[in-house]
């Protein structure tokens, strides 16, 4: 199954969406300072800009398509200018079609400058947060919005704190296995459609549910199951890092499957290598327990650098070497 698809990315978001959403997910509040149509302004980049050089008159390399941050330095520079010069400088700034302006640390602009921004259809906001905190939060929010993402067919489950992505052909029982794991106390992230994001150059992949399907599951022969209603809030997760891929395979007696676990495999998702476990399925095989052991093995390797197959191999080699040494001593 090819999971390494190119990935999609939002081209832009409206300033209205930015203003209405960021405060719900982050510890930051913005207040409007003017009334313009925020739907007409769009943000195209995750990077922000502090227009110090543009205020000083150098606009050759002005990245005006980014959200503009005016902190203590920029506002004090404007305020120390004579009114006529200040108006000229700010008029030169707002002639560019920027998404919006954010004032940090409760800084203020004279009303005539706000009127200039309004006439140019540029939204202006203010926050009590410092420039450092504002840039950190807004950059993180835009990172999420413009991150690479792709939708995959499968189920995503939190097993002992390990994010396990179940993949495989339709009809192999991915949803049934995920439901069994939920019944055993683990958490469902998504079923059928798993949305995976990669933020920036990070090597971390985060999986989320499809907002339409939410935490509903379709079980063949039973129908639709509402996991949250049936099992409670403890049975669901909003987001989880993809740490292990378990691919379910139809049993084929002609294929020699891995028996020791020394052959480490991986699957590339959005350019990131994720550990892969291939599980052949046949009637009577308890896949749920095996997936729990997969998660526990992942934790053992991550926190103790312990791999059972390597430990057994080392033990066998020690016995062989010891017996060989005893034979040499008899000679």
UniProtKB/Swiss-Prot annotation:
EC number: 2.7.11.-, 2.7.4.-
Claim: Transferase is one of the keywords in the record: yes
Domain remark from Swiss-Prot or TrEMBL: The Walker A ATP-binding motif also binds Pi and PPi.
Gene from which the chain derives: hprK
Important for the catalytic mechanism of both phosphorylation and dephosphorylation: annotated segments: 217-226
GO biological process, one term: regulation of carbohydrate metabolic process
Annotated source species: Pelodictyon phaeoclathratiforme (strain DSM 5477 / BU-1)
Lineage start: Bacteria, Pseudomonadati, Chlorobiota, Chlorobiia, Chlorobiales
Biological role stated in the UniProt entry: Catalyzes the ATP- as well as the pyrophosphate-dependent phosphorylation of a specific serine residue in HPr, a phosphocarrier protein of the phosphoenolpyruvate-dependent sugar phosphotransferase system (PTS). HprK/P also catalyzes the pyrophosphate-producing, inorganic phosphate-dependent dephosphorylation (phosphorolysis) of seryl-phosphorylated HPr (P-Ser-HPr).
Identification of the protein by name: HPr kinase/phosphorylase
Source superkingdom: Bacteria
PANTHER family: HPR KINASE_PHOSPHORYLASE (PTHR30305:SF1), PROTEIN YJDM-RELATED (PTHR30305)
Any one GO molecular-function label of the UniProt entry: ATP binding
Keywords, alphabetical: ATP-binding, Kinase, Magnesium, Metal-binding, Multifunctional enzyme, Nucleotide-binding, Serine/threonine-protein kinase, Transferase
């Amino acid at each position: 199954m090819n999971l390494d698809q190119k990935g999609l990315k939002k081209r832009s978001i409206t300033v209205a969406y930015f203003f209405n959403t960021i405060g719900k997910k982050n510890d930051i509040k913005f207040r409007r300072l003017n009334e313009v149509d925020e739907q007409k302004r769009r943000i195209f980049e995750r990077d922000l800009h502090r227009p110090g050089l543009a205020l000083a008159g150098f606009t050759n390399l002005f990245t005006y398509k980014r959200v503009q941050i005016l902190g203590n330095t920029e506002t004090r520079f404007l305020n120390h200018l004579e009114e006529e010069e200040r108006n000229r400088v700010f008029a030169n700034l707002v002639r560019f079609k920027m998404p919006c302006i954010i004032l940090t640390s409760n800084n203020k602009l004279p009303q005539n400058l706000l009127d200039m921004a309004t006439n140019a259809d540029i939204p202006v906001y203010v926050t009590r947060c410092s420039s450092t905190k504002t840039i950190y939060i807004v950059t993180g929010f835009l990172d999420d919005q413009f991150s690479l993402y792709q939708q995959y067919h499968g189920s995503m489950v939190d097993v002992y704190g390990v994010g396990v992505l179940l993949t495989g052909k339709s009809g192999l029982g991915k949803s049934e296995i995920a439901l069994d794991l939920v019944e055993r106390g683990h958490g469902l992230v998504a079923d059928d459609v798993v949305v995976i994001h990669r933020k920036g150059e990070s090597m971390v992949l985060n999986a989320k549910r499809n907002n339409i399907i939410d935490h509903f599951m379709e079980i063949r022969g039973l129908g639709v199951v509402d996991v949250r209603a049936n099992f409670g809030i403890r049975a669901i997760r909003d987001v989880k890092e993809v740490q292990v891929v378990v691919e379910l395979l139809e049993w084929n007696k002609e294929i020699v499957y891995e028996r020791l676990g020394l052959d480490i495999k991986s699957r590339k998702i959005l350019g990131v290598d994720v550990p892969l476990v291939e599980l052949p399925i046949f009637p009577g095989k308890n896949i749920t327990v095996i997936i729990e052991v997969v998660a526990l093995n992942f934790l053992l390797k991550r926190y103790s650098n312990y791999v059972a197959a390597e430990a057994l191999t080392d033990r066998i080699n020690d016995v062989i070497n010891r017996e060989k040494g005893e034979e040499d001593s008899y000679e």
